[in-house]
Amino acid sequence: MRLIPLTTAEQVGKWAARHIVNRINAFKPTADRPFVLGLPTGGTPMTTYKALVEMHKAGQVSFKHVVTFNMDEYVGLPKEHPESYYSFMHRNFFDHVDIPAENINLLNGNAPDIDAECRQYEEKIRSYGKIHLFMGGVGNDGHIAFNEPASSLASRTRIKTLTHDTRVANSRFFDNDVNQVPKYALTVGVGTLLDAEEVMILVLGSQKALALQAAVEGCVNHMWTISCLQLHPKAIMVCDEPSTMELKVKTLRYFNELEAENIKGL
């Protein structure tokens, strides 16, 4: 596992965006051989999406031959609702870059057959071979996507019940009213995530410090979903300074020394 220790959320966004752009450009995608990118929603990736849009407008990257799969979507929330993940992604990213509509894949939380929707999502991912890079965030309790604590580390795309803590955390997007936050969501599984060629998790804020500690210094444990990254051959954690407050000094020093060349210029 790589840990990229930075100072601010803006630096995390810029580093992550630069990494994505470098991966896409090195891949040299074509219509017949697209780069497949997994994407999250929420507050954490906002600085990354902003940086990606800026890099696209500066001519540094094209998304014309990029295929995206989003991590999750609320169940029962209309697609046009401002807080649906469909709306979030278009508002913050898709509408500002040159990605074709047919290359965008989002789970349908209003599908008449939820099980079939989840199964078809997995099949479509497999039809591309694999996701080349899956970017995500992490919850205070260590969840990735909506894989809440005690999720199977072999799980696939499915419907999940959201914990009260997750709904409270997400209520900031719903007028701070937890009753407006859906109780269920569709989410890729931990196994789906681990199948990706590379996984990059962004970690921001002191409230994520215990989750980061569990991921880096703890044991693999289904109560801390984030710890599954220890099983992945190519995992990256990109974090700001407040999120590292629970790490041992020697752990942080170790990764600072390892990544010194990769965090220059931010």
UniProtKB/Swiss-Prot annotation:
Its EC number is 3.5.99.6. It catalyses: alpha-D-glucosamine 6-phosphate + H2O = beta-D-fructose 6-phosphate + NH4(+). Changing D141N: Large decrease in activity. It comes from the Bacteria. Allosterically activated by N-acetylglucosamine 6-phosphate (GlcNAc6P). Competitively inhibited by 2-amino-2-deoxy-D-glucitol-6-phosphate (GlcN-ol-6P). Coiled coil: none annotated. HAMAP family: GlcN6P_deamin. GO terms for molecular function: glucosamine-6-phosphate deaminase activity; identical protein binding. This is Glucosamine-6-phosphate deaminase. It is an enzyme of class 3 (hydrolase). It comes from Escherichia coli (strain K12). SUPFAM superfamilies: NagB/RpiA/CoA transferase-like (SSF100950). InterPro entries: Glc/Gal-6P_isomerase, Glucosamine6P_isomerase, Glucosamine6P_isomerase_CS, NagB/RpiA_transferase-like. Homohexamer; trimer of disulfide-linked dimers. The keyword Disulfide bond applies. Changing C118S: 50% of wild-type activity, but 2-fold decrease in substrate affinity. Belongs to the glucosamine/galactosamine-6-phosphate isomerase family. NagB subfamily. The gene is nagB. Catalyzes the reversible isomerization-deamination of glucosamine 6-phosphate (GlcN6P) to form fructose 6-phosphate (Fru6P) and ammonium ion. PROSITE patterns: GLC_GALNAC_ISOMERASE. The record marks S151, R158, K160, T161, Y254 as: Part of the allosteric site.
